[in-house]
Each structure stands twice: as C-alpha cells, then as structure tokens.
C-alpha cells in the first residue's frame, strides 16, 4: 500500500496539488506482542527493529514520504489522546451493549 500511496503522492505533486504523504508503522496489537515474545524481546524492542527495517526499505525504494510516524511515537500518542478526549467530551464514546459481528 505504501508504494501505491507513493505513486499517488508523486502524481498529486506533479499536477500541482499541495500534498503531504504520511506513512509509518502500526506497532500495536497481538501480532506484534506475540512476535516479540517468540523472539525473547520486549514489544518496544521488536517494534524498534521492524520500524527501522521498514524505514530503511522505503528509503532504498526512494519512497517520497514527507513524514514517517510510528504508533509508539510520543507525538502520535498525544494526538490520539486529544482526539479521543474530544470524542468523549462530545458524547461520542459511551458504554453500552453492542450486538454485531465484531
């Protein structure tokens, strides 16, 4: 998906659109935790390793991203906290019973 996004970003810049291409790594979830555990590493250590590999690969492929962000970045965490607080304050987050597929 990053290569496709890069293609779109390059095209958008070529036709004169103001373009900001953000990419990065999602470092949360059970898969990351399990992969770290099987390697005898902490989740953060494993995320650091994998994120570094992705960033190096994107640089090698000359991906034209403007910013590489990780879900473990302090900046990202702060942004998520602000967004969730706004949703909570508006009443968009609440406890209830849910019926559905997920």
Identify the residue ranges that each predicted region occupies.
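N-terminal, positively charged nucleic-acid-binding surface of large information/translation enzymes
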Residues: 1-102
């Amino acid at each position: 998906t990053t290569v496709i996004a890069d293609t779109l970003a390059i095209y958008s810049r070529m036709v004169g659109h103001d373009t900001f291409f953000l990419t990065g790594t999602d470092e949360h979830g059970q898969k990351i935790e399990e992969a770290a555990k099987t390697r005898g590493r902490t989740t953060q250590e494993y995320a650091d390793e994998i994120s570094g590999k992705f960033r190096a690969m994107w640089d090698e492929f000359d991906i034209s991203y403007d910013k590489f962000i990780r879900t473990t970045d302090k900046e990202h965490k702060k942004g998520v906290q602000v967004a969730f607080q706004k949703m909570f304050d508006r009443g968009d987050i609440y406890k209830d019973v849910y019926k559905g597929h997920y």
